[in-house]
From Swiss-Prot:
Stored InterPro entries: AAA+_ATPase, ABC1_TM_dom, ABC1_TM_sf, ABC_transporter-like_ATP-bd, ABC_transporter-like_CS, ABC_transpr_lipidA, P-loop_NTPase, Type_1_exporter
Membrane topology label: Multi-pass membrane protein
Transmembrane segments: 66-86, 103-123, 190-210, 290-310, 317-337
Domain ABC transmembrane type-1 as annotated: residue spans: 67-349
List of residues binding ATP: 416-423
Keyword Cell membrane found: yes
Gene source species: Bordetella pertussis (strain Tohama I / ATCC BAA-589 / NCTC 13251)
One Pfam family, short name: ABC_membrane
Written domain comment of the UniProt record: In MsbA the ATP-binding domain (NBD) and the transmembrane domain (TMD) are fused.
Role played: Involved in lipopolysaccharide (LPS) biosynthesis. Translocates lipid A-core from the inner to the outer leaflet of the inner membrane. Transmembrane domains (TMD) form a pore in the inner membrane and the ATP-binding domain (NBD) is responsible for energy generation.
Protein name, UniProt field: ATP-dependent lipid A-core flippase
Transport as UniProt keyword: yes
Length: 623
């Protein structure tokens, strides 16, 4: 396996020749960076209050369903103390035969109360699930909207696992725990208040003993809150790391097999898996310790209640029915109190998940300060004026004072060694990368003055790494037109891309699904499908980013023929690795270390015997 994976923390790269453990060092560095970035601010009270406000402002948008659910929970809560109250007449009068109608009335009352509680609980749970799922849909919609608007640089960080976890796990935890908190807080609080009322009515002296122990239980719960918050935050981080490691194992399975990377990948996975287990056990330990400690406090109170009750019974101040009713109410109060004390853990998990979700929602979208649209008709003139760019932490400019003009309909090829700045330069045109200096003009209009929608609507891209969506061939081709297009246009585009014959041979023709990552298509077929998509868009400026570099000779020939049709009448910027594909360009610009060192037609550059000639001759010797 490789000694260093791009996009991981700096500590992962071996310094001074030191070899690191690929199953431990990078993951450890990544986890510690995640933890450091996420720890301190989240624990502050203002941040917690802001998270609460943001979560429940979204829940409050569905206040009608919420209010109805609360009323139903109140109805369910009212049945519990009533069941306890029934114990007194049942024992004092029912068994003595003093009131014969109790023989049928009390059993029916018990059944009716339990039935009422079941109905109220069902509909309140349904309404809360309705609220939760609507809020979840809204939050995920906000997250996806922000995801689509993030700058291109944000996607270069390689934190795919963390992003996926935010959508699949964190967003669900926010709404799930938020409604759980409402359910427990409302339902169990009402039950506790009602039962305490019954207890006070039965015997205020016995009730005071119970009330003395409640603050102790609350204090224990608060003591565990901060620890649970930290543990849950680390668990979220480790879940993201686990997702990333598994995702890399799936995507890189061929490399793992060919380079015998089984042991390295097992070590990477075992490290994350074991660390996740440790945090899960810490969380489970804290949760498990909270309940028995609370129960010990309650049991002390129960022991004191029994002692005082026996004393009152001996003096005739307390009947058997009253004591049984009191104990029934007391027995019912334990579970609600337990659920209320456990609420701290759910609150912390909700806040950790909310922090993760809103971190994405609050990220700054790509700058779109332009207000102009390209004047019609769009000609396709492109000019770079002294454009420079340096990536953060780089020791030199990736692109340095580059200037050139591409007239409408011209084809200009950018060539040079790897790292010479070709891709960075071209990525500035659609504003995926922003220049640090200089200007880029599209039809004599500075691109920063244009809206992103106007600018990008007049650009098409065909790259080496073709992105196709898990949909039909027709849908992928029609994507270039921004939506559904008629079958005739799709077929025309496929024909121009030399792909129609293949597509017609499929059982469903143009309506055949391409599968995830277009796994059912070959590399050449994917490229030609991307060309058909660009043909449908019919933009005046075309960017070709090493579109044929990964193809075999036959596929390259077919794709090259399709590209020639696509390039006709369009301004084209070509990034080429195979110099044989750019010989017919109107002009070739040779870059080295971010600067233009040569430019001109193919024949002139060969005759000049400079860098271009050196690269060209080197390739043909290799061929």
């Amino acid at each position: 396996m490789l000694a260093w994976r791009p996009g991981r923390p700096d500590g992962c790269q071996a310094a001074g020749g030191r070899r690191y453990n690929p199953g431990h060092d990078c993951i450890k560095a990544s986890v510690s960076l995640n933890s450091a970035a996420r720890n301190a601010p989240a624990g502050s009270q203002p941040v917690k209050a802001e998270l609460w406000k943001r979560v429940y402002s979204r829940v409050g948008s569905y206040w009608k369903g919420l209010v109805l659910a609360v009323l139903l929970m109140a109805g369910a809560a009212a049945t519990q103390p009533t069941l306890a109250v029934i114990m007194k007449p049942l024992l004092d009068d029912g068994f003595s035969g003093a009131k014969p109608h109790y023989v049928w009335f009390l059993p029916l009352a018990v059944v009716g109360l339990i039935l009422l509680r079941g109905i109220c609980n069902f509909f309140s749970d349904y309404l809360l699930a309705w609220v939760a799922n609507n809020v979840l849909r809204g939050i995920r919609g906000e997250m996806f909207e922000r995801l689509l608007g993030l700058p291109d640089a944000d996607f270069k960080r390689g934190d795919t696992g963390r992003l996926l976890n935010r959508f699949t796990i964190d967003a669900g935890n926010v709404t799930g725990y938020a409604t759980d908190v409402i359910t427990v807080l409302v339902r169990e609080t009402l039950v506790v208040i009602a039962l305490i009322g019954v207890l006070l009515y039965m015997s205020w002296a016995l009730t005071l003993i119970i009330l003395v122990m409640l603050p102790v239980s609350v204090g224990i719960a608060r003591a565990f809150t901060r620890r649970l918050r930290r543990i849950n935050r680390e668990t979220v981080n480790m879940n993201a790391e686990l997702t990333r490691v598994v995702s890399e194992g799936i995507d890189g399975q061929r490399v793992i097999k060919l380079f015998d990377g089984y042991d390295a990948e097992r070590r990477r996975f075992d490290f994350v898996n074991s660390r996740l287990r440790r945090f899960a056990m810490r969380s489970a330990t804290a949760d498990a310790a909270l309940t028995p400690l609370t129960q010990v406090c309650i049991s002390v109170a129960v022991g004191a209640v029994i002692a005082v009750a026996l004393s009152q019974a001996n003096s005739g101040a307390l009947t058997v029915g009253s004591f049984a009713s009191f104990m029934a109410a007391l027995a019912q109060i334990f579970d609600p109190i337990k659920r209320l004390t456990n609420l701290a853990g759910k609150m912390q998990k909700m806040l950790v998940a909310a922090e993760s979700v809103f971190t994405l929602v609050d990220q700054t979208p790509e700058a779109d300060a332009g207000t102009r649209a390209l004047p019609e008709p769009v000609r396709g003139k492109v000019e770079f004026r002294a454009v420079s760019h340096r990536f953060p932490d780089a020791d030199r400019d990736t692109v340095s004072a580059v200037s050139f003009l591409v007239e409408p309909g011209q084809t200009v090829a950018l060539v040079g060694r790897s790292g010479s700045g070709k891709t960075t330069l071209v990525n500035m045109l659609p504003r995926f990368v922003l220049p640090d200096g200089g200007d880029i003009l599209f039809d004599d209009v500075p691109i920063q003055d244009l809206t992103l929608r106007s600018l990008r609507s007049h650009l098409s891209l065909v790259s080496q790494d073709v992105v196709l969506f898990d949909d039909t061939i027709a849908a992928n081709v029609g994507y270039g037109a921004g939506g559904t297009v008629d079958d005739a246009r799709v077929r025309d585009a496929l024909a121009a891309a030399n792909l129609l014959e293949f597509v017609d041979g499929l059982p469903l023709g143009i309506h055949t699904p391409v599968g995830q990552n277009a796994a059912r298509l070959s590399g050449g077929q994917r490229q030609r499908l991307a060309i058909a998509r660009a043909l449908i868009k019919n933009a005046p400026v075309l960017i070709l980013d090493e579109a044929t570099s990964a193809l075999d000779n036959e596929s390259e020939r077919q794709v090259q023929a399709s590209l020639e049709r696509l390039m006709r009448g369009r301004t084209t910027l070509v990034i080429a690795h195979r110099l044989s594909t750019v010989q017919n360009a109107d002009r070739i610009i040779v870059l080295d270390a971010g600067k233009i060192v040569e430019h001109g037609p193919h024949s002139e550059l060969l005759a000049a015997n400079g860098l271009y000639a050196s690269l060209y001759n080197m390739q043909f010797r290799e061929d």
